[in-house]
């Protein structure tokens, strides 16, 4: 199964994270399929940069985000776009 999760980068005591698409059997910092953005929790306010189109595409393909990534993607507005796409597909099927 393909997951969307965080991989840790940065120095000791100064983490930042990449949001990546990875096979769930891989290590946390192992090889990944694609990078979707990054998250820096140390900055005030935190920095969140997500390629929304790529994230939507992977979610529609069936990639499961981890709970933390799900919260971050919700803040970035990814799930609103996913819902809109699903609604338009249902409307097209009904007509």
UniProtKB/Swiss-Prot annotation:
This protein's GO CC annotations: cytoplasm; small ribosomal subunit
Keywords, alphabetical: Ribonucleoprotein, Ribosomal protein
Top-rank taxon: Bacteria
Gene Ontology BP annotations: translation
GO molecular function: structural constituent of ribosome
Keyword Transmembrane in record: no
Matching Pfam families: Ribosomal_S16
UniProt family annotation: Belongs to the bacterial ribosomal protein bS16 family.
Protein name in UniProt: Small ribosomal subunit protein bS16
Organism listed in the record: Thermosipho melanesiensis (strain DSM 12029 / CIP 104789 / BI429)
Gene encoding the protein: rpsP
């Amino acid at each position: 199964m393909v997951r969307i999760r965080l991989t840790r980068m940065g120095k000791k005591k100064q983490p930042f994270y990449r949001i990546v698409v990875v096979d769930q059997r891989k290590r946390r910092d192992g090889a990944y399929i694609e990078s979707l953005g990054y998250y820096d929790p140390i900055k005030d306010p935190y920095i969140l940069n997500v390629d929304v189109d790529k994230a939507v595409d992977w979610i529609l393909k069936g990639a499961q985000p981890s709970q933390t990534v799900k919260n971050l993607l919700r803040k970035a507005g990814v799930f609103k776009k996913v819902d809109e796409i699903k609604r338009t597909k249902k409307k097209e099927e009904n007509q």
